[in-house]
Amino acid sequence: MAGTGSFKVTRISEGAVKPAAATPEETLPLAWVDRYPTHRGLVESMHIFRSGADAAPGVIRDALARALVFFYPLAGRIVEPEAGSPAIRCTADGVYFAEAAADCSLEDVRFLERPLLLPKEDLVPYPGDDRWGVEPHNTIMMMQITKFTCGGFVMGLRFNHASADGMGAAQFINAVGDMARGLPEPRVKPVWDREKFPNPSIKPGPLPGLPVLALDYIVLDFPTGYIDGLKAQYKAHSGKFCSGFDVLTAKLWQCRTRALNLEPGATVKLCFFASVRHLLKLDRGYYGNSIFPVKMSAPSETVLSSSVMEVVDMIRQAKERMAVEFFQFAKEETEQDPFQMTFNYESIYVSDWSKLGFAEVDYGFGPPKFAGPLVNNDFIASVVILKAPLPLDGTRMLASCVTKEHSEEFVRGMKEDLP
């Protein structure tokens, strides 16, 4: 495993971690949303801990085996008994787990702030067919613990979106933490219940084209006090409450639209996914995908001429429409695939990781300094909102949403009223 510059990561061990006790052998159907073609892939994330390196590999390996007894489908494989209908075969074959060691401290690599001073391929597992023998889109989860000389460690995780959404993946990782701290069972017991998600006859639309956009990578931090101030402004504007996500996303959409300097009459789009757990009254332990897109489209002039608070109004109205649109989808009152996306430079996609639960995971060494996705692509203009790394207080944006040509104006707008 090659490092960057003088730093090197060496793999110590690898193999399958299987459930610690016998589990049912069965094939479980996935929900409509789980089966969606774009969800058949591994989401990569990085979880950085300041201490615990010596004990972490053994503790987490053992806890993983015990957690898989409760979450036994995750120890299986994705199969496709019928074309277009993937399912999980509960084989107890296990989760890929690797232990590695870096010859540097976390401080040496700036706690893996961007740009990374170690390749992500050294931090998250890419075993290849010769060492794992399972195609990535049929693998449910892979994990790697990398120890650093300072006593800290990094968990690199690859989790198949077909098996769980972000909240479900965090539920499982928290269950591993529960086992690591000696609990006899997870605090939140898993529930399958995939049949409770609607299963309309709507066919997924064709996969969209993916343009190469050559996006810049930008990190922005917003203190809690600043976000609270924006929320207070919205309360004064409307008499209603809003979330930090609402105000930051409104500011983001407006600043990005201004930075793009589009031709008059251009349409700009914003999309994010919202949970429908409350609409379906799902059990707290449900860990499958339970998301639905919230989409907005407006002339660029409208976004630019509105105040940030008026853009918040637009976002909140779209969130309110989501419930109606979801039940239209569930009752097959529409023939359109609501998950069909348009990927062009005028469209932006926002993902909220701030409340999923990854930042609260504790394996007995305290919560992570940072937990977030390893996303940096050149074909989807996207932003991830998540908790700022400790000891910072507030929210971080990981933005891959503008080209270098537009990044200076975008950053200037986002920072112009920061304290």
UniProtKB/Swiss-Prot annotation:
Gene3D superfamilies in alphabetical order: Chloramphenicol acetyltransferase-like domain
Alphabetized InterPro entries for the sequence: CAT-like_dom_sf (IPR023213), Plant_acyltransferase (IPR050898)
Pfam assignment, any one: Transferase
EC id: 2.3.1.-
GO MF entry, a single one: hydroxycinnamoyltransferase activity
Disulfide-bond pairs as recorded: none
Keyword tags: Acyltransferase, Transferase
Catalytic residues as annotated in Swiss-Prot or TrEMBL: H161, D362
Keyword Transferase belongs to the record: yes
Annotated function: Involved in the incorporation of ferulate into the cell wall. May act as arabinoxylan feruloyl transferase.
Family: Belongs to the plant acyltransferase family.
PANTHER family, sorted: ACYL TRANSFERASE 4 (PTHR31147), ACYL TRANSFERASE 9 (PTHR31147:SF34)
Name by which UniProt lists this protein: Acyl transferase 9
Species this chain originates from: Oryza sativa subsp. japonica (Rice)
Gene responsible for this protein: AT9
